[in-house]
Amino acid sequence: MFTENYKNIIKHFDSDLNISKLSNLKKTLIDFSIFNKEIHLDPKQTPYFIEYFLKNIGITVTYAEDPCTHLKLIKNKVEIKGFKNSHIRDGISICKFLFWLEGNVKKNKVISELIASKKLFDFRKKNKLFRGLSFETISGYGANSSIIHYRVTNQTNKILKKNNLFLFDSGAQYLDGTTDITRTIFIGDKPTKEQKDIFTRVLKGNLELSNHLFNKNILGKNLDTIARYHLKKKKIDFPHGTGHGVGSYLSVHEGPISISKNSKTKFKTGMILTNEPGYYKKNVYGIRIENILLVIKKKNLLGFDVLTLAPI
């Protein structure tokens, strides 16, 4: 590993990991070229500078996917058990948060996007195996919920007033697993006919994908159409993929698997990925429902086990 902050990082690892300052990268590549004249690079993962530099010092560059990515995709029994246990704990935190949110809304207490985000964090951090968030929480109310990758700041922070939608997309890193969940909650008691219709269509897509059975030759792009079907009947859609891979106490976005319009992913038992259809009406509201799925065998076919344990 080469990084400018190597002194701060190296103290957290043992001698099995070589960490050096970034300025040593060129020398290391030159030393490598003395005894090695060919190298495999993953074009999706390798910075162009490294490829360019290797070619200039006489190394033959060939291309192949990093084999480590495929080994990570198939979770073993310990990792699967950890995922299930971490989702039980995470689900309890989500339920406590939803109970707190509903109770305080009924009492007309002032709750902002930032307050809600911090409260959810506080519930999660009480878990002994909690190690931090898996990504920065998306906590958006009303118009802010229509921004797919919204990040609340002091300047954009909105109060959760009655009669609009609140979307929170959040996840945690536990020592035994990683979580990623999105829920969309109506604040108040008078959702519009349109909001009820769109929410139902998003929910149908989520549930139908979760319950779908398919053979091993089905691609990610084929499953993607299931999540979009009920929205497309109304001639609307969402501008992102339906799902991404999830690492085991690693990156919450783990490639190369996905469920999206161009995905050529083939699925195998033990893979873990998200299911997150949505709809976003610009500057008005956003709806997304996200669960994590485990690929399993069902009736000589493949299917999904929903790991996320929280009410929709």
Identify the residue ranges that each predicted region occupies:
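Active-site neighborhoods and metal-handling regions in enzymes and metal-associated proteins
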Residues: 1-312
